[in-house]
Swiss-Prot record:
This is Tryptophan synthase alpha chain. It comes from Streptomyces coelicolor (strain ATCC BAA-471 / A3(2) / M145). CDD domains: Tryptophan_synthase_alpha. NCBIfam families: trpA. GO terms for biological process: L-tryptophan biosynthetic process.
Length: 271
């Protein structure tokens, strides 16, 4: 079975044709439970997200701030496994028809087996994978299997990436380029920063692939700011925080849906 890279490409192109940025939500699998995590993904999509990244929780998430680490810890204590990530992708995609990616560090895939992981992700209806710590020069095996199974390979670029490095990354990536707008770990910050705009400009000089910005957006005004210069706005910690701060799971889901609706206005310039 082929994965849904084309659905991802079409979704991003449709947003562009509407003169807006795409809204991409990040939520960890297994948080607060596997079923609850699936409901959260569906709530984000119902609220207005175009795409969702499902995180594979990791015990040492080097790029993630305290909010996502807390959610990952809850998911790991609950015993979340790769099979649960695949179930999350499958059920969310079947319920919504929207593109779902997995965001994961390389080590779990390496242990699980690249062919097994890509085949199962495609079979679940996944659109691709974001691999923040996989160096491009070590990605040939992954890309071979991802291409075979119709999955996007999304690499992360940062303000510290030199122009030659950006060209190297964008030459082999697919789906979109994940531009990390601030150096350091994920979280919500007061200002997304001018660094992001410069990074998008430099990345676009090397590719026609959409460039989406993550790390720092938490409200409609910030989403509108980023949507002014990027092809997509990626929001993670703000969704997770809504769930962590909620008095119960139902309120958490409503918080996710409401935030997605607010951000969806932002990417349309209605903030």
């Amino acid at each position: 079975m082929s994965g849904n890279v084309q659905l991802l490409n079409d979704t991003l192109a449709a947003a562009k044709s509407e003169g807006r940025a795409a809204l991409i939500a990040y939520l960890p699998a297994g948080f607060p439970t596997v079923t609850g995590g699936i409901e959260a993904v569906k709530a984000a999509l119902d609220g207005g997200a175009d795409v969702v990244e499902v995180g594979l929780p990791h015990s040492d998430p080097v790029l993630d701030g305290p909010v996502i680490q807390t959610a990952d810890d809850i998911a790991l204590r609950g015993g979340v496994r790769i099979a649960d990530v695949m179930r999350t992708v499958r059920e969310a995609h079947e319920a919504t028809g929207k593109p779902i990616l997995v965001m994961t560090y390389w080590n779990p895939i390496d242990r699980y087996g690249v062919e097994r992981f890509t085949a199962e992700l495609a079979e679940a209806g996944g659109a691709g994978c974001i691999l923040p710590d996989l160096p491009v020069q070590e990605s040939a095996l992954w890309r071979e299997h991802a291409d075979k199974h119709g999955l996007a390979t999304v690499f992360v670029v940062a303000p510290s990436s030199r122009d030659a490095r950006l060209a190297e990354i964008t030459a082999v990536g697919s789906g979109f380029v994940y531009a990390a707008s601030l150096m350091g770990v994920t979280g919500t910050r007061a200002s997304v920063g001018a660094q992001a705009e410069d990074l998008v400009r430099r990345t676009r000089a090397t590719t026609d692939t959409p460039v989406c910005v993550g790390l720092g957006v938490s409200n409609a005004a910030q989403a509108a700011e980023v949507a002014g210069f990027a092809d997509g706005v990626i929001v993670g910690s703000a969704f997770v925080k809504r769930m962590l701060d909620a008095p119960d799971d139902a309120a958490g889901l409503e918080g996710v849906r409401a935030l997605a609706a607010d951000l969806a206005k932002g990417v349309r310039g209605q903030a």
